[in-house]
């Protein structure tokens, strides 16, 4: 067989142009597909259906972690330690050189191992998102990964699929295919039987089978892949890293410049002493672990998100999710269960001689019996026996749903040999199909409105005979049969999740294709408000007179949702919100949602989304419902909080080391040992690595990188700690305060013992600072993670042991005993407490909200009192008054000035009372009665397919 396929492998046969029957001959296959064994054999010949992956050298990847601006500074310090530090009759500083190299290797090793683990975990997760396809093997259809496809396979292509390989279409209705990613064509191309479709293009309409003619690198896309620009854009996260790194490097440069100017021309210090002082600033000031800590934190966070049912395709989407303040959510399946049921008693029949059960049967016949969507499953499931949907008939042709026609249809032959068609779909489309008269349209619209007031969707059914007995014929005129009510109950957790979202500062807007009345009713039930508008208002059309003067941007920003929405409206909503500086999330599941998902800051493909929607999204949900998204927001904020905590810590330590040791060196000409700074840096890095798993409180508001806050906090905290160290040095080295007060031995005149004391003081406070930066409230009230706590105490036991017992001549230290160690710990603890107060003061100056953290550990997501609940109640009251025909104030004054809420609260309370009365009335309707009886009998209305009272 291999020799027979050589021409195909070498591309000597033009499978794109030859007749379709010759394609089967050349590929040595049939319309029945390949066998499993033949598929495996061909996989060895043609290779997997994926592009070649670039193999990266592990060694080069490892060395790459030493190639960034922060590492360059450390490498410069290492060279300096042996090339420049050999003056004054002293040998090169080999200890510092080896220590710096060890520090670089340790950081690179941790980065390499963690990124490798994260990469493997991400690869495993992404494998679950790998494109899948329906393939015919061994005479059976099954869903397989697209990578196993080989030339000769028969595949099924339907709406929303990304075409898995180059293929020729077989018999069936034409497809509409979006090839813009490959050819640049903006409009979908129509492809009929026998024509070629390319791998990577998206099916926009239709359903058909095809024979695969090329896979992997042999496809049109595979050949062009090397032309695709693979340049990585510098993301926002990388820009932040660069800005913080540059700030630290500039701070060190300032410190070094001041030291050089003062030490050599003014103080005329020895060359080697000056080099040691410069090494201290270079080694201690550079946050060498920053890229490692932040990358590891993000990788671990991404893994945690996947465990919660949210797979991140783009790592930096985590920081955008943390800052999201508007979520545009689909209704069906996200806010509701997408478990549809039909109340038979409410079915309206418009055709003489037809019973309600027959309307249901027609709807079931116009549904799939396999590979069903929610509506198909509901229709077939309502039959006494699902087999009735195809009982006594022979299926000729099924027209699948598409976003343009918004209907499905089945052509079939009955037991008498007569041809018929039935169709179900959106009422407006079915009415147009039947060329319905004005009086019929009026009656149908009245029924639809009646359903909508109860939150029920409408599905219309029609039928026709086909005298010509061919599937291509138009048939006799269509007859409008009836309308069915569909009830899609809200998820049990949706109302609570929306309340949580509001408390977190995320405004949830419902974006639905359903009618306005249904959207308002669902919004009312979920407590998200009924301030909703039809999609036509987005284009400035059909606005009420009261809101005609409101700009579209304001309308989108203030609305609780929009109904009757098409994909182009979703894109417009996202665009306008982004223009108003909102960080916007958008959920979607269909191929037509892809542009809006791409445009949104965070595109979220919901569970069971099409391949096209998944491809355009940043985050793919593996579980249904809004609660997954809100959990992901909380987790993202926790991840972001860890990263922000570390950056503040890194800036603070740089300022503290640079200016603390610079002042000591210049004022008292005391030269701290570069080796001891290395020990501090190594212990700090070991402790700080655990921050990626720290227990943190997520921010109660949408969070983002605020460099002003990071730098301001870092400078103030670092400056305070530098002064604290300088004061300690002065008190211990130049006065008898500590010996007189605590009866410890005098360190004056003993430089080596002073070195040990100074080392311990710097080590304790440097690491203790992380507890201040990691907490939003008092640092001693927010319990840290166990790993961080253990790492801190282990590092401090080592540091204390070195200070107490160390006697290293090369590092110029000598043990100071437990008495001095206790004094230094006491000094550090006493001067630790003001750090929290300074943190609050900086936040208060910058944002004016930090004092709320001191009082109740909570920051409101808005400056409005009670989370703006009064404003929402006022809008809700406005809608209720309109509903009941009461007089309203001008729309422009719906949101009043401060102080006018009391009156509106009273209006809201009155409206609520009227709403409660309306609900009581609703209980006396048939649907309300059914729900009451079902509840009394202890049945679950969500799981019950249907119930008869």
From Swiss-Prot:
Any GO MF annotation of the entry: magnesium ion binding
Tissues with expression: Found predominantly in phloem cells of leaves, stems, roots and flowers. Expressed in guard cells and barely in mesophyll cells.
Pfam families with a match to the protein in the record: Cation_ATPase_N, E1-E2_ATPase, Hydrolase
Phosphothreonine: modified positions: 882, 948
Record family assignment: Belongs to the cation transport ATPase (P-type) (TC 3.A.3) family. Type IIIA subfamily.
Effect noted on mutating residue 949 to A: Impaired fusicoccin- (FC) dependent activation by 14-3-3 protein
Intervals, Cytoplasmic compartment: 1-62, 116-244, 293-644, 695-710, 774-785, 836-949
EC number(s) per entry: 7.1.2.1
Residues bearing the modification Phosphoserine: 932
Subcellular location: Cell membrane
Lineage: Eukaryota, Viridiplantae, Streptophyta, Embryophyta, Tracheophyta
UniProt protein name: ATPase 3, plasma membrane-type
């Amino acid at each position: 067989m291999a020799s027979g396929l050589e021409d195909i492998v070498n591309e000597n046969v033009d499978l794109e142009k030859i007749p379709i029957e010759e394609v089967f001959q050349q590929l040595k296959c049939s319309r029945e597909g390949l066998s499993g064994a033949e598929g495996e054999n061909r996989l060895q010949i043609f290779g997997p259906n994926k592009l070649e992956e670039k193999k990266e050298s592990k060694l080069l990847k490892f060395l790459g972690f030493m190639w960034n601006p922060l590492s360059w500074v450390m490498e410069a310090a290492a060279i300096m330690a042996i090339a420049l530090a050999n003056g004054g009759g002293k040998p090169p500083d080999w200890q510092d050189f080896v220590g710096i190299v060890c520090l670089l290797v340790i950081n690179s090793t941790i980065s390499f191992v963690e990124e490798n683990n994260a990469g493997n975990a991400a690869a495993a997760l992404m494998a679950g998102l790998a494109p899948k396809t329906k393939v015919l093997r061994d005479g059976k259809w099954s869903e397989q990964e697209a990578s196993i496809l080989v030339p000769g396979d028969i595949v099924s292509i339907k709406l929303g699929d990304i075409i898995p390989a180059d293929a020729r279409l077989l018999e069936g209705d034409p497809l509409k295919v979006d090839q813009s990613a490959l050819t640049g064509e903006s409009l979908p191309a129509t492809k009929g039987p026998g024509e070629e479709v390319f791998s990577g293009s998206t099916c926009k309409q239709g359903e058909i089978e095809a024979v695969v003619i090329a896979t992997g690198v042999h496809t049109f896309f595979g050949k062009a892949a090397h032309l695709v620009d693979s340049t990585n854009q510098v993301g926002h996260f990388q820009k932040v890293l660069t800005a913080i790194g540059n700030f630290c490097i500039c701070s060190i440069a300032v410190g070094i410049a001041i030291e050089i100017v003062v030490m050599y021309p003014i103080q005329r210090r020895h060359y080697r002493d000056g080099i040691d002082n410069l090494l201290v600033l270079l080694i201690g000031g550079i946050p060498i672990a920053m890229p490692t800590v932040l990358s590891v934190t993000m990788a671990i966070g991404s893994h945690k998100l996947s465990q919660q049912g949210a797979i991140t395709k783009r790592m930096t989407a985590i920081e955008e999710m943390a800052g999201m303040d508007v979520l545009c959510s689909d209704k069906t399946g996200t806010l509701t269960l997408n478990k549809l049921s039909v109340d038979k008693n409410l079915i309206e029949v418009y055709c003489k001689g037809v019973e309600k059960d027959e309307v249901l049967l027609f709807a079931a016949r116009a549904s799939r019996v396999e590979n069903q969507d929610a509506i198909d499953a509901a229709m077939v499931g309502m039959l006494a026996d699902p087999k009735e949907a195809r009982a006594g008939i022979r299926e000729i042709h099924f027209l699948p749903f598409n976003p343009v026609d918004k209907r499905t249809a089945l052509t079939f032959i009955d037991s008498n040999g007569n041809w018929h068609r039935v169709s179900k779909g959106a009422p407006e489309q079915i009415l147009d199909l039947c060329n319905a008269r004005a009086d019929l349209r009026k009656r149908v619209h009245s029924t639809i409105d009646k359903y909508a007031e109860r939150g029920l969707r409408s599905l219309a059914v029609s039928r026709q005979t086909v005298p010509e007995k061919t599937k291509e014929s138009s048939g006799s005129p269509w007859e409008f049969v009836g309308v069915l009510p569909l009830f899609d109950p809200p998820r049990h957790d949706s109302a609570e999740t929306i309340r949580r979202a509001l408390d977190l500062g995320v405004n949830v807007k419902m974006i639905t294709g359903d009618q306005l009345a249904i959207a308002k009713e669902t919004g009312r039930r979920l407590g998200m408000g009924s301030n909703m508008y039809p999609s036509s208002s987005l284009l400035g059309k059909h606005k009420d007179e009261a809101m005609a003067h409101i700009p579209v941007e304001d309308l989108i920003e203030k609305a609780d949702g929009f109904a009757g929405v098409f994909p182009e409206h979703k894109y417009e909503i996202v665009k306008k919100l982004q223009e108003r500086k909102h960080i916007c999330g958008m959920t979607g599941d269909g191929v037509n949602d892809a542009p809006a998902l791409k445009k949104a800051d965070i595109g979220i493909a919901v569970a069971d989304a099409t391949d096209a929607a998944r491809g355009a999204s940043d985050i793919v949900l593996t579980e249904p419902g809004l609660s997954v998204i809100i959990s992901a927001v909380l987790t993202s904020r926790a991840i972001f909080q860890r990263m922000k905590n570390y950056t503040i810590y890194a800036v603070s330590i740089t300022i503290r080391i640079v200016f603390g040791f610079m002042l000591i060196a210049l004022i008292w000409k005391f030269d701290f040992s570069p080796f001891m700074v290395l020990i501090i840096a190594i212990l700090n890095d070991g402790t700080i690595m655990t921050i990626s798993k720290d227990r943190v409180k997520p921010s109660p508001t949408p969070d983002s990188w605020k460099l002003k806050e990071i730098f301001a906090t870092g400078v103030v905290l670092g400056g305070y700690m530098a002064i604290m160290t300088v004061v300690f040095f002065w008190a211990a080295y130049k006065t008898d305060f500590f010996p007189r007060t605590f009866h410890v031995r005098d360190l004056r005149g003993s430089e080596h013992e002073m070195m040990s004391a100074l080392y311990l003081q710097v080590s304790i406070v440097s690491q203790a600072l992380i507890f201040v930066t990691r907490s939003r409230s008092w640092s001693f009230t927010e319990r840290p993670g166990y790993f961080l706590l253990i790492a801190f105490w282990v590092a401090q036991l080592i540091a204390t042991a070195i200070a107490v017992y160390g006697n290293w001549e090369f590092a110029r230290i000598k043990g100071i005993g437990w008495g001095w160690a206790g004094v230094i710990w006491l000094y550090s603890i006493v001067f630790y407490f003001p750090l929290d107060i300074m943190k609050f003061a900086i936040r208060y100056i910058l944002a004016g909200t930090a004092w709320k953290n001191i009082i109740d550990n909570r920051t409101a997501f808005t400056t409005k009192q009670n989370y703006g609940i009064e404003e929402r109640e006022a809008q809700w009251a406005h809608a209720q008054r309109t509903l009941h025909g009461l007089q309203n104030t001008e729309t422009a004054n719906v949101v009043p000035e401060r102080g006018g809420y009391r009156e509106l609260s009273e209006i809201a309370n009155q409206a609520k009372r009227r709403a409660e009365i309306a609900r009581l009335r609703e209980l006396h309707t048939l649907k309300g009665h059914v729900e009451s009886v079902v509840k009394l009998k202890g049945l679950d209305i969500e799981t019950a397919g249907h119930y008869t009272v």
